[in-house]
């Protein structure tokens, strides 16, 4: 980690009561406790900024840059005034890509919500119990928490912790006379969608899946064990017919999103145009406020569920779509939430770089490892890349060149 990095999480020792709750609840053992004095300190090298310690501290002695209590309350208050909605939907980043589909998830649970306040977080476990009651005080009538399944949680214990808090809060609210439907939990994990009619039985997905979730079948298409699938997206990259894709990150949908963005920004004579493929867990602020990123840096952010889902085809296609440079932001090997199969991602990047080198476009692409624990690290690397691309002439590729060796047929 950069020595000049500003830490995203800090313990205020003047407020700390030495209760050690944070020490016992941290899923990454990132909080050290002195056995003699009881003093607790955060080991930033281990910290994943899940926010679970922050939400558990009874005296609010832990300061956190992202999604703090006051910021969350202010957001809900502003959205109440803006939308008039009385329903708050809390959703984990792992089960709700920026493209939406929240309505579909709610409808599948029998909930018909036309107007709601969306609050998207890296983990549901970082919501303080006090915030639930604050949201109700601000005028919220119903709160729906869309949680990942326990085994799917990217922060290990986040789902379990939030479920326990919701259960206790719900029991208390009922004693106070609130409706049973005031708080509701929905379990949902974003996994692959498999269209067997498109499958040709090549079994590439069987070979590439790092979690053993896909099994070859004799004289039949592969079988997916959805309980084992973690939605990393490795299988989607190797499927030649897009028969298997991660819901919310479908190839054609992603292609249309950045192609239309490039067309719109080009029409506004923006230069340089930067496209950022960003792992959901490597950066928080840019993915939460993509409009701000566009206004400040003329950059478009596209989420990917994991480094393994970074498709070389999209990188090449985006350059042909009008972007002057493409930047990929992923977690380091130590921080990766889905470590299995990391070598697959590395091989994909090697292939991508070889193709870009042959096309004389290698300087137009950069891969960075970033962590939200270091405040401002993403912006620093984006600034460096922006200046580099700005020093080059605008990229103008002939449409005919788009038929390159990477492109899926």
Question: Predicted regions span which residues?
Answer:
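A short, flexible N-terminal coil/short beta segment enriched in small residues
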Residues: 36-38, 62-94, 249-281
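Gly-rich Lys/Arg/Thr-decorated short loops/hinges at beta-loop-alpha junctions or inter-strand turns
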Residues: 1-6, 111-117, 147, 216, ...
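Peripheral docking tails and interdomain loops at the edges
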Residues: 175-191, 197, 358-406
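Short Fe-S-cluster ligation motifs
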Residues: 50-61, 84-86, 229-245, 263-268, ...
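Cofactor-cradling patches in redox/metallo enzymes
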Residues: 119-173, 303-378
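Mobile, glycine- and charge-enriched loop segments
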Residues: 82-125, 266-308, 399
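Ferredoxin-like iron-sulfur electron-transfer modules
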Residues: 1-18, 29-49, 67-77, 182-208, ...
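Local cysteine-cluster metal-coordination motifs and their immediate loop/turn environment
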Residues: 17-28, 45-59, 143, 148-157, ...
